[in-house]
């Protein structure tokens, strides 16, 4: 295939908050800045305005539907869009849209790339069949080595198609020098922090598997002085919050641990912290929060599994605890709190260099666009 300006269509369920959604927005911007035409098709969401600003065309379509009875109608609507826009390559970012869109690759005679953001497990045959659509493309993007391994475990014959492209951090957005004093002061008032007491931050959505309860237990064993803000826990249900608050009271941590709602300025909130903990009980596919903390020069602590194992070198740019081990997590937190200022600075500098070299937004976009170009060049060669 030879053409002056290729059109790439990314398809995903919706454009609300999440790593998949942010990745699509970032790639779409990189496409328009690199002489590609960028199309995104989804059921919509608040990221639509960002797409319009970067020159991407967005089509609203019910590609999030998991009802097979609707797929033929939606596929026909999608086919019209792809033909009218003369799309040259499809990038499918989730399972339901992939089941709808994948057949159009062969119908329209264009290459198809899929992204896998979730861990595949050896479950029942129906789940395996549902997941299998993400392995059928001309190329597969795995967002971490952990995800690559899970794909190969369940679908061993597709290993040759897998390309590991780690999710990236926007180094301008997460640059300490770019966070103005006014933003920090505003967040400081919201967090209501005590002066001269180390700050531990956990920022996540309100789900028990994210490790909120385990962290609270670990903190009860820490002898050093600290204050901890659980950002996002305050968005949880009344029942969810009650479980955590009851535990905080039972362990006599009321003066040290508080639940807060999520913030629109996570950069300013994290810059106020000394340590960022992400104690997910099950392996995270990647966990961008750990890298965002490193980009800000903070010390990340996580369990040694999933994506965290790929982004933290224990003792160099953060600390890894034994998976789901409260005592190990507590000891790592105590170790981080006991570091001298010069030791923290050394870890922070190593962390920033690690992100800049290996996990930047620019590197992610460059590798993804390079894969697009390769697939376009090789298709029907």
Where are these regions (language model features)?
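A conserved mid-protein helix/loop that constitutes part of the nucleotide-sugar donor-binding site
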Residues: 18-26, 198-221, 242, 327, ...
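Short hydrophobic beta-strand element within catalytic cores of glycosyltransferases
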Residues: 40-41, 299-302, 312
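Glycosyltransferase donor-sugar binding loop
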Residues: 41-46, 169, 203, 227-242
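Short His-centered aromatic/hydrophobic patch
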Residues: 92-98, 116
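A conserved, positively charged/aromatic
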Residues: 106, 112-143, 149, 156
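A short, well-ordered alpha-helix in the C-terminal region of glycosyltransferases
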Residues: 198, 328, 335, 342-358, ...
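Active-site donor-binding acidic/aromatic loop of nucleotide-activated sugar
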Residues: 236-241, 254-263, 269, 319-320
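Conserved acidic donor-binding segment of nucleotide-sugar-dependent glycosyltransferases
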Residues: 314-315, 319-326, 335-341
